[in-house]
A protein has these predicted regions:
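Arg/Lys-rich, positively charged N-terminal/basic patches that mediate binding to nucleic acids
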Residues: 1-30
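Short, charge-rich, low-complexity interaction segments located
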Residues: 22, 44-51, 85-88
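Enriched for short, Lys/Arg-rich terminal
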Residues: 69-94
Length: 94
């Protein structure tokens, strides 16, 4: 599972926000991201396409989703980590 630069930036932003709210909460957020990445590595096809070739996995405990693409060699590319309240039209997209 690879994380593209925009997804990494969004994760870092969310981490900082949660850590500011409560020390340690940012670490919890990163652990949930890691658990989701493990799920994607094991069985990415368990998550059906939502828009064309893009798929998403909802994070546990946090109102975020990882938007990803399943590449032809069965690699997973995480394109975005978006809060549920953000416009779904913003990402994923071509």
């Amino acid at each position: 599972v690879g994380f593209e630069a925009p997804a990494q930036a969004e994760i870092a932003e969310a981490f900082a926000w949660y850590e500011e709210k409560s020390y340690g909460l940012g670490g919890d957020f990163l652990r949930v991201i890691a658990a989701a990445a493990e799920q994607l590595a094991r069985n990415p096809e368990a998550f059906p396409p939502t828009r064309g070739r893009f798929r998403r996995i909802l994070l546990r405990r946090f109102p975020y989703a990882l938007h990803f693409e399943l590449l032809t060699n069965h690699r997973v590319s995480v394109l975005a980590c978006l809060h549920h309240r953000r416009s779904p039209a913003r990402w994923p997209g071509p």
